[in-house]
Amino acid sequence: MIDSDGFRPNVGIILANHRGEVLWARRIGQDSWQFPQGGIKHNETPEDALYRELGEEIGLCASDVEIISCTRGWLRYRLPRRMVRHNSHPVCVGQKQKWFLLRMLSPDAHVRVDGTDSPEFDGWQWVSYWYPLGQVVSFKREVYRRALRELAPRLFHNMEQWHRAENPRRMKEHQK
């Protein structure tokens, strides 16, 4: 499902633990990391897509998380020209995303990146809230910045928490 401007509707998932760290997942067979995300199917709401993608990509269900907030509108990024498939119709030039901020309610052991026949990730880790901005592929960076900035006040309620989140650090990586 691609809109008239060539953008595919999509949900982005920022999953935070009780320390305000966020789940950062490694694309299978690559040294590329990102937040879980995925397309919205025809007749599916963004929230429906969120829960489907949560299950498909990291093995969690609705009872494992709590929705804290979501972005007010759609955030868009364009794909680099080399990634646009001009032979497919309609042509997809990028993604428009509704971002959700979730709180993890279950133990870390519930996260499973290998729970499907075709997993998208082969590892994950908890990282400080702002760490992904310096690590994500460049064409997604502005959307990540906008989503993280808009949602941060919903996660961090005082300046001390905010400053702790600004300390970019990696945590122990989990393999599948």
UniProtKB/Swiss-Prot annotation:
Short sequence motif named Nudix box, residue ranges: 38-59
Domain named Nudix hydrolase: residues: 6-149
Cleavable signal peptide: none
Cofactor(s) in the UniProt record: a divalent metal cation
Gene Ontology BP annotations: mRNA catabolic process
UniProt cross-references to InterPro entries, sorted A to Z: Nudix_hydrolase, NUDIX_hydrolase-like_dom_sf, NUDIX_hydrolase_CS, NUDIX_hydrolase_dom, RppH
EC number, as in UniProt: 3.6.1.-
Record's GO cellular component terms: cytoplasm
Keywords associated with the record: Hydrolase
Pfam family name, one: NUDIX
Gene Ontology molecular function: any one: mRNA 5'-diphosphatase activity
Hydrolase recorded as keyword: yes
Cited CDD domains: NUDIX_Ap4A_hydrolase_plant_like
Function, in words: Accelerates the degradation of transcripts by removing pyrophosphate from the 5'-end of triphosphorylated RNA, leading to a more labile monophosphorylated state that can stimulate subsequent ribonuclease cleavage.
Cross-referenced NCBIfam families: PRK00714.1-1 (NF001934), PRK00714.1-4 (NF001937), PRK00714.1-5 (NF001938)
Annotated family: Belongs to the Nudix hydrolase family. RppH subfamily.
The protein's name in its UniProt record: RNA pyrophosphohydrolase
Species, as recorded: Marinobacter nauticus (strain ATCC 700491 / DSM 11845 / VT8)
Gene symbol of the encoding locus: rppH
